[in-house]
């Protein structure tokens, strides 16, 4: 089975080699969310320009970006002397009036391509991805910095189709050595408005509907329980006050009756008459 880097390189080939190459979107294995609203990740041209014969000298690869349109579909990136264009993002209105140079990187010899088997190593994952991929639209500050030096790779426009081209430049002569075809149109993602989001419950799972229903009705039941607890506490307090008042009334009515009627009745009936009769009897004896 051929190494994975060979598979990636062959994925960028179209109809042969040399000028018949096209830049391709990065594999979903390495860039799951691609393109985004403002960025596009591409596979670097590994083993493309030097696949048939080794190159001698120092070379760089320039990446050009162009907004897709009928008038600029086959736009040139070099002048009549084969000198590569140095147009910037600002000069071309973000690629709308012509291609601009978004990035430049050294050409990695085919024999020095890093092994993708090491991508499982977390410490080397970023290094390997940078060796195989290039992302367009990652610099969000270069347009705002008046002192910025170098290539400006600002965010792309959302919902816009772009084309991309790799150009091989011989750094000794400063001339174009080779180049790919323009890529097929690649469209950046579109911002989804909140009003366009489908919230119909029919597209939700049964579990989501049950959980949503429970959470929605839970505050209602809590409110009912709280109100019931308040009513019960008020009823219990009223019963306790009524019982205390009833006991105090019974006590107040019972005490005067026992002190005011029993004792005087007992004294007047049992003791009063017997004392009067004894006094009368004693006076008669003295006479």
Swiss-Prot record:
Component of the asymmetric unit membrane (AUM); a highly specialized biomembrane elaborated by terminally differentiated urothelial cells. May play an important role in AUM-cytoskeleton interaction in terminally differentiated urothelial cells. It also contributes to the formation of urothelial glycocalyx which may play an important role in preventing bacterial adherence. Residues 1-18 form the signal peptide. The chain crosses the membrane at residues 208-235. Disulfide bonds: none annotated. Glycans are attached at residues 74, 139, 170. It comes from Bos taurus (Bovine). Residues 259-271 have a biased composition (Polar residues). Residues 236-287 are cytoplasmic. Its main location: endoplasmic reticulum. The keyword Ribosomal protein does not apply. One of its GO terms (biological process) is urinary bladder development. This is Uroplakin-3a. It is a single-pass type I membrane protein. The gene is UPK3A. CDD domains: UP_IIIa (cd09970). InterPro entries: Uroplakin-3, Uroplakin-3a. Heterodimer with uroplakin-1B (UPK1B). Residues 19-207 are lumenal. Belongs to the uroplakin-3 family.
